[in-house]
Amino acid sequence: MGANSIPTDATIDLDEQISQLMQCKPLSEQQVRALCEKAKEILMDESNVQPVKSPVTICGDIHGQFHDLAELFRIGGMCPDTNYLFMGDYVDRGYYSVETVTLLVALKMRYPQRITILRGNHESRQITQVYGFYDECLRKYGNANVWKIFTDLFDYFPLTALVESEIFCLHGGLSPSIETLDNIRNFDRVQEVPHEGPMCDLLWSDPDDRCGWGISPRGAGYTFGQDISEQFNHTNNLKLIARAHQLVMDGYNWAHEQKVVTIFSAPNYCYRCGNMASILEVDDCRNHTFIQFEPAPRRGEPDVTRRTPDYFL
């Protein structure tokens, strides 16, 4: 459906829901269920390496920081005027995971060609039960149904994206089991994120200053050196790997002689880290511009009701 298509009852309903969500007001359980059932049909048709055209704005972790997502849209432009590619970790840690992920899924439904939403390591049943999304769903809906609806939907999110055959985008990093993009295209991704193996690595690995493959301190995925990213980019005719997954104080960080960039889009992460956030604008000519931003003003934010583990990875 084009951005300027004739309104139907479905798009009018979606526009109303998006308007409600932009005010940080959650949808009903029934609305979430209907939205996610339809979203599943769209996401099912997308590739494990989803092709994306430029211009596009590439974003990193959001982690339930809804007001900062609204600030991101204010700075970068609202969908569908701006095309977006989000690289995962929409939920956990922040206070508004429900509103954040619902808004992104609603925008995906309304403008499927204008927004791409990849899976992060937090789009998982196991992780969300520890780091906040499960508890938030219980608090806001009185039961775990919405958590189950979303975690079932997460299984359908694409794992990676490819911007104009040049920029490879994913949440985490590379895998010793993956040499080519075709290796990724051949996965069955519709499952909970495994504890090990190539699908796990794509969502958990990190670039490192040391050459070769290393054991990750996270307990999942690997670290990979410049030699690995150079070989992967050469084999697959890529110019850049864009990824998220790590807090970087300036909102973005180059690695491996500008073969890899980390983008992090949650400013003052966990409401205490003091970092900037950034987004990466890629224009029609594939030129890159980083836009940094600070936290949005927050009003009436709740206190954290229960201490969550200090897992800053």
From Swiss-Prot:
The record lists Mn(2+) 2 as bound by: D89, N121, H171, H245
- Cytoplasm is among the record's keywords: yes
EC class (word)? hydrolase
Q: Which GO terms describe its molecular function?
A: metal ion binding; phosphoprotein phosphatase activity; protein serine/threonine phosphatase activity
Query: What note does UniProt attach to the cofactor annotation?
Result: Binds 2 manganese ions per subunit.
In this protein, the active site sits at H122
Q: Which GO terms describe its biological process?
A: primary root development; root development; stem cell differentiation
Q: Which Gene3D superfamilies match?
A: 3.60.21.10
- Kindly state which reaction or reactions the protein catalyses: O-phospho-L-seryl-[protein] + H2O = L-seryl-[protein] + phosphate; O-phospho-L-threonyl-[protein] + H2O = L-threonyl-[protein] + phosphate
Q: Where does Mn(2+) 1 bind?
A: D61, H63, D89
The job of this chain, per UniProt, is described as: Functions redundantly with PP2A4, and is involved in establishing auxin gradients, apical-basal axis of polarity and root and shoot apical meristem during embryogenesis. May dephosphorylate PIN1 and regulate its subcellular distribution for polar auxin transport. Involved in the regulation of formative cell division in roots by dephosphorylating ACR4 protein kinase.
Q: How does it assemble?
A: PP2A consists of a common heterodimeric core enzyme, composed of a 36 kDa catalytic subunit (subunit C) and a 65 kDa constant regulatory subunit (subunit A), that associates with a variety of regulatory subunits such as subunits B (the R2/B/PR55/B55, R3/B''/PR72/PR130/PR59 and R5/B'/B56 families). Interacts with ACR4. Interacts with TAP46. Interacts with SIC/RON3.
Protein name from the UniProt record? Serine/threonine-protein phosphatase PP2A-3 catalytic subunit
